[in-house]
């Protein structure tokens, strides 16, 4: 009789424990399905050591990378590259390799999934963000914003933007905001 009582008590305790833990598991699952900002350590497993652009291979700088891992498993990320083997005209514009698995918008411009060259160019009107296709042809240019208050700038990083679902791609203190296309 005592064995049956202990067994029932154990089963009751186990059931209560599982019921108490269920809301925590549901909350954790919901948190796991949010977009995540990626830092260099997060990208180490998926970032290639070198990338193809305009007929050549360029070494990536994993320490200067960042991106977003979307809740549905897709990625958008960028990394600085060693562009020393390219012509001066390409070096001026091609500073980072940008990969997106989903359609996004940058400064009002639509960008389809793919791999691109990107960079910040400075001219009389200020800093501009340029996007090039894999053949180094200009796709679009948009104004970059200078953020003098940005603490601890690095050569390249991604942060959350002003609104949910918006992200900032920083080159030093200059940034452009991007979001997943709707």
Segments and roles (model prediction):
Residues 10-22:
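Bacterial N-terminal signal peptides
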Residues 1-6:
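N-terminal secretory signal peptides that target proteins for export/translocation
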Residues 9-10, 95:
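Short hydrophobic/aromatic segments of transmembrane alpha-helices and their interfaces
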Residues 26-89, 138-182:
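Primarily secretory-pathway and cell-envelope proteins
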Residues 23-24, 104:
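Generic detector of short, well-ordered, non-transmembrane alpha-helical segments enriched
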Residues 83-137:
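Mid-length scaffold segments of soluble, non-membrane domains
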Residues 15-16, 61, 96:
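Generic detector of short alpha-helix boundary/capping microenvironments
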């Amino acid at each position: 009789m005592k064995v049956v009582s202990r067994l029932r008590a154990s089963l009751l305790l186990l059931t209560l424990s599982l019921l108490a833990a269920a809301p925590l598991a549901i909350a954790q699952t919901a948190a796991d399905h949010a977009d995540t900002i990626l830092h260099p350590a997060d990208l180490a497993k998926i970032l290639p050591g070198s990338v193809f652009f305009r007929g050549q291979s360029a070494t990536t700088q994993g320490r200067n990378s960042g991106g977003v891992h979307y809740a549905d498993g897709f990625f958008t990320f960028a990394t600085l590259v060693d562009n020393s083997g390219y012509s001066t005209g390409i070096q001026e514009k091609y500073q980072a390799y940008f990969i997106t698995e989903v359609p996004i918008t940058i400064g009002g411009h639509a960008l389809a999934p793919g791999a691109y060259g990107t960079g910040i160019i400075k001219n009389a009107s200020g800093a501009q963000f340029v996007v090039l296709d894999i053949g180094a042809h200009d796709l679009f240019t948009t104004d970059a914003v200078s953020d003098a208050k940005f603490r601890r700038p690095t050569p390249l990083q991604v942060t959350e933007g002003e609104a949910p679902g918006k992200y900032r791609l920083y080159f030093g203190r200059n940034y452009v905001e991007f979001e997943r296309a709707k």
